[in-house]
């Protein structure tokens, strides 16, 4: 390929040279010939040889044309060299390594922790962890062939305008991974009562196999036209039933129910929170993880500096729309920065209707073994 292009370029150069006069020189312009006409009769002697300015000018090559041809040759060579060197490169396995467990029902996906997923303490946040869980869950549904038109909807669900909505999520974090780490998310689904679906997750360190995070999420069906909850049709049950496993990552007794909170009992309140276009998912529904961002808006920075979230329970009570205006409320209990903290959260519409309740438990960062580095000074306080 490169040889062919070079030959073509040289042929172009030859054609240009042949277009010149018989001596291979491009004739000068008529204007130049007129200016040199009188000089033809007046020849100078240089070293005993007659010298004509006109003849000398005719013998000079057209350097601009020569430069253009050389540029064409090198451009063609560079292009062909690039084509020969480039080859499609497979995706790194740690980024898109999807596979199933021994029984074909436990889905696994690996994630490399990116620089934009870590914070000032060099570890990931609870939001980054939940993003990995959500991505693994959707790819699980896609891999088993039950992903229809939308996030997590089957074909029969799409026919009936049904979607899954999360009712409750509980996350327990033992350790947060750091930038450059690779984690593996295991996920599987099971039944929860007669009309619910349970999604369970384990997050492991790919190097050690250590369990970093356990999560369970309960979903129910909602009709997108009526915006009301719906029973699971038998046709849908037939689609999802074969993928169910009777196993849990977190037992129900481990989950602590969030407590009621109101304006008078809250320590911190922030209003004026509104959904944006980028907060909506493919189902035209506010992404569940966006609610977590709103909840944490009212947690003081001093807590983030000194503590990690060790567990997170969130109960969704109603959805919000693009024109909703919300308030985030938080109350803190637990004492000094050396001890664990508990926060109760409420997200409500400005009119007072509850959107969700949540509870977060926090442990001091000093108790974490983070590569042998103490990231928070001992004198820090809440």
Curated annotation (Swiss-Prot):
<keyword id="KW-0378">Hydrolase</keyword>
<dbReference type="GO" id="GO:0016297">
    <property type="term" value="F:fatty acyl-[ACP] hydrolase activity"/>
</dbReference>
<keyword id="KW-0276">Fatty acid metabolism</keyword>
<dbReference type="InterPro" id="IPR045023">
    <property type="entry name" value="FATA/B"/>
</dbReference>
<dbReference type="Pfam" id="PF01643">
    <property type="entry name" value="Acyl-ACP_TE"/>
</dbReference>
<dbReference type="InterPro" id="IPR002864">
    <property type="entry name" value="Acyl-ACP_thioesterase_NHD"/>
</dbReference>
<dbReference type="GO" id="GO:0009507">
    <property type="term" value="C:chloroplast"/>
</dbReference>
<keyword id="KW-0444">Lipid biosynthesis</keyword>
<protein>
    <recommendedName>
        <fullName>Dodecanoyl-[acyl-carrier-protein] hydrolase, chloroplastic</fullName>
        <ecNumber>3.1.2.21</ecNumber>
    </recommendedName>
</protein>
<comment type="function">
    <text>Plays an essential role in chain termination during de novo fatty acid synthesis. High thioesterase activity for myristoyl-ACP.</text>
</comment>
<keyword id="KW-0275">Fatty acid biosynthesis</keyword>
<feature type="transit peptide" description="Chloroplast">
    <location>
        <begin position="1"/>
        <end position="83"/>
    </location>
</feature>
<keyword id="KW-0809">Transit peptide</keyword>
<keyword id="KW-0443">Lipid metabolism</keyword>
<feature type="active site">
    <location>
        <position position="283"/>
    </location>
</feature>
<feature type="active site">
    <location>
        <position position="320"/>
    </location>
</feature>
<comment type="similarity">
    <text>Belongs to the acyl-ACP thioesterase family.</text>
</comment>
<dbReference type="InterPro" id="IPR049427">
    <property type="entry name" value="Acyl-ACP_TE_C"/>
</dbReference>
<keyword id="KW-0934">Plastid</keyword>
<dbReference type="Pfam" id="PF12590">
    <property type="entry name" value="Acyl-thio_N"/>
</dbReference>
<dbReference type="GO" id="GO:0000036">
    <property type="term" value="F:acyl carrier activity"/>
</dbReference>
<dbReference type="InterPro" id="IPR021113">
    <property type="entry name" value="Acyl-ACP-thioesterase_N"/>
</dbReference>
<keyword id="KW-0150">Chloroplast</keyword>
<feature type="active site">
    <location>
        <position position="285"/>
    </location>
</feature>
<dbReference type="Pfam" id="PF20791">
    <property type="entry name" value="Acyl-ACP_TE_C"/>
</dbReference>
<dbReference type="InterPro" id="IPR029069">
    <property type="entry name" value="HotDog_dom_sf"/>
</dbReference>
